[in-house]
Amino acid sequence: MNDCENFSPSPEFKWLCDELLGKIYETSSKKHLIGKPVTVRYLEIITNFIKLWRSTVGNYIYPALRLIVPFRDRRIYNVKENTLIKALCRYLRLPKSSETENRLLRWKQRAARGVKLSDFCVEEIRKRQKDYEGANRITIDELNGYLDEVSQEGNGKRMGYMALTDSRAFNYCLNHMTFMEMKFFFDIILKTRVLSGLENMFLTAWHPDATDYLSVVSDLDVLSQRLYNPNERLRQTDLSITISHAFEPQLAKRTHLSYERVASKLQHDFIIEEKMDGERLQIHYINYGEQIKYLSRRGVDFSYLYGENSSSGPISPSLKLHFNVKDCILDGEMITYDTEKDIVLPFGLVKSSAMNQIQSELAGIAPTESYKPLFVAFDLVYLNGKSLTNLALERRKDYLTKILTPVERSVEIIQYMKAINAEAIKDSLEQAISMGSEGIVLKHLHSKYFVGSRNTDWIKIKPEYLEQFGENMDLLIIGREQGKKDSFFCGLSISDPNEVAEKPRFISFCTIANGLSNEEFKDIERKTWGKWHIFSEDPPSPNLLGFGTKVPYEWIHPEDSVVLEVKARAIDTKESEKRKYRSGCTLHFGYCKQIRYDKDWKTVASFSEFEDMKDARNFYNKRKSHQVTDGKKRASKRAKIGIVNSSEPTALVAPVSNTFSNCRFRVISDYFDSTKRRRISQEDLCSVILEHGGEIVYTSDENNLPQDNLYIIGEKLTRECKILLNAKNLIIRPSWIFSCIEEGYKTPFTESDIFRGELESSMDCSQFYTDFNTASLNHLLETANRGIKNPDSDLLLPEVPLFLFSNLKLAVLNSENVLDTSILEVEFAIKCHGGELVHIENASIIIVFNDFISREDLFSLRQKIASKAVKESTESTPRIPRMVDISWALDSIKDNYIAETEHYQCL
């Protein structure tokens, strides 16, 4: 028997869950209850499992490894979170758009740290059926077979929930799995981590070279067959790239150094390439084109999209290589090209363009869209059995041009220019911005190719958009408050990091908890592990960090920390916030947009930069309507809303008022508060009601008939709402809830309070009775006087977001093809919504009628902007205005929310 083969039948999947996955999950969720360091406990669980596998199953770990590291498995299920949720609701025979389905679709809003969608799904199933106790257990090999079946049913396309529910394999697994098995089965289907970020620990425990080897082969099966004996170590030559196995490519590093410093870092001998907006792919050309693989950096095979041999697909037939080339690997970018407009389109259309061409070829008709995939090669890393990674970039480029013949609009070689100084960088960046490109990439001409590395041999330079500055800020984590979901204290730099300053190097600015996924929380924890200091025991030096009255439980040195890109709609300068944070103000509704891996503590936002835009984002202080607690401190704990429907109403132990005592509420939709421009979820509405003495019910009687003291709250005409209306129910707007809280009693309904339904004239009005006495009259007069003294607040139109574009500097581009009246209408709408109209040179956002402007005029405008920005910038990150289509302004006004400008770029 081969030493790599297993000598025992495949164990049950439940055994894998019990011995490894379940123990890791339990340990990660109960760290504080473990009497030893959690890392030690993790290692014990993993090593014990590996010993158990080797002694009872064998040395071939691949069947289990595919389930333990699902995101590195090459199977493609194309099952998205929403698809799984809807499929499970259909499996449970729940009505379409049910409350359960809607809650699951919004699971991230209620997810504590470490909680995944699979936990919510299993909880719903647990409420409706018993745990599986049958004798027919699914083995690991059987589960892999069922997953193969699900992958084949997807056939490279995104699987819909109907198809998933009808899948024989999917249904069999659900009917023959315990709740714990289901949890990890769902994680595997969604390709999320099942080992709590401990994959590298597991691989290293299996074999010391496993992690390094996986970075050059990206194939779990190859790894399992090659590294079955931990005592046999790999040679250095084994860790080089090989044909048909994906590897992690070299990446460019972003820097904010001056142009001169960048040129110096590249030893004044480098090339400049355009930065492409596409998907990084490597083409493996095998045996003269008999087989061609298109692999992503993580080993995902997209050959079915672009052509599995030289005669199939939209790209492979255009790979014209020298007749002596038997095998090679091309590193490059797959982009989307519009053949009609002769332009490169945004990244999101890459795969759909390939699928459109494939479907058109199969149907024997012309493509329905004008866009198609285009591969741009920029490196050659393998040729005829030899790795070229140790060769200088100049030689690799030379070989690339000799073996590959470009085919226009299908396969091209990226153009580059040699450079030696900062002036060349400026000129190239100016040209890239003029063309609407992402930026440029600089590469040291004599550098080697470093697999899986991001270093300064390759440097990318991208412009920063003015519109982002003031809404998007790169902030450094300087502290954290631990809880179910960690909140991070973020700070601003207030001094030059290269100088010794008396002031703190960083000061607290805001606390961020929203926007980070569980995986990002774990990634931050991995990067900062062992570097936190307890504030009460070891406070930071005031010359290092400065905090206000609000201090974190733990703090961290800036050089050990992580940078977050934080987005917010306003700046909060209330007196209470001035004391909490050392900066004297904070962000209102701030959330993390992404972790900035390309930045460090030296390149984050500074306090002086923040001061330049602070006044433009303080209008929230002027809007005081719908204040729930009238300035009083709210209860520190809110009612916890269940994640599933409950037949019993939920009650609060200690409400802050009795405004809604003896009243029951059924909340059927979210609420958008137009005065504060924020959305309040169903769960938060329920919490507010509970805090003021009300009860929450999730269902009415089976006929949905009106009931005494039952208030149905909603402002969306959903299917559930229509059913309740047909049963003669009255649907009340959520704004009535806040009106009652402000007044301190249940106010009578007015027409504006009714969303749908008719208010019966004969209804019992005793429920609105209040004891009107002298104190009440004085309160009423005081309220009226306040309104007279401050008439501005009454003049604000609550339904019109007057401050939507507040202090944004906008310009509408004039064009001879656009009527003057159309331009005036747009400018008037911008002014009505608080925008400031300025000249194009001073704008942070330029609004263009994209369908009515010529490409020549657009290029000319970009050229002027680029020239000005590059000349004025001292760092290699010029700030330029964003150019957006007119639909950006119209959609923002329509939705009462500033739309993401990157989705409306002019092409």
Curated annotation (Swiss-Prot):
Residues involved in Mg(2+) 2 binding: E438
Q: Which residues form the BRCT domain?
A: 655-754, 800-906
* Residues annotated to bind ATP: E273, K275, R280, E333, F378, E438, K443, K460, K462
Q: Which cofactor does it need?
A: Mg(2+)
UniProt: Mg(2+) 1 binding residues: E333
Q: What is its EC number?
A: 6.5.1.1
In this protein, the active site sits at: K275
The catalytic activity, as recorded, is: ATP + (deoxyribonucleotide)n-3'-hydroxyl + 5'-phospho-(deoxyribonucleotide)m = (deoxyribonucleotide)n+m + AMP + diphosphate
Kindly give the InterPro entries that the UniProt entry links to this protein: Adenylation_DNA_ligase_IV, BRCT_dom, BRCT_dom_sf, DNA_ligase_ATP-dep, DNA_ligase_ATP-dep_cent, DNA_ligase_ATP-dep_N, DNA_ligase_N_sf, LIG4
Kindly give the CDD domains that the UniProt entry links to this protein: Adenylation_DNA_ligase_IV (cd07903), OBF_DNA_ligase_IV (cd07968)
- Which keywords describe this protein according to UniProt? ATP-binding, DNA damage, DNA recombination, DNA repair, Ligase, Magnesium, Metal-binding, Nucleotide-binding, Nucleus, Repeat
* MF term (GO), any: metal ion binding
- Principal localization? nucleus
Which Gene Ontology terms describe the biological processes this protein takes part in?
Answer: DNA biosynthetic process; DNA recombination; double-strand break repair via classical nonhomologous end joining; nucleotide-excision repair, DNA gap filling
Question: Cellular component per GO?
Answer: DNA ligase IV complex
Tell me the compartments it is located in: Nucleus
Q: Which Pfam families match?
A: BRCT_2, DNA_ligase_A_M, DNA_ligase_A_N
Q: Which family does it belong to?
A: Belongs to the ATP-dependent DNA ligase family.
Describe the function of this protein: DNA ligase involved in DNA non-homologous end joining (NHEJ); required for double-strand break (DSB) repair.
NCBIfam families attached to this UniProt entry? dnl1
* Name the UniProt record assigns to this protein: DNA ligase 4
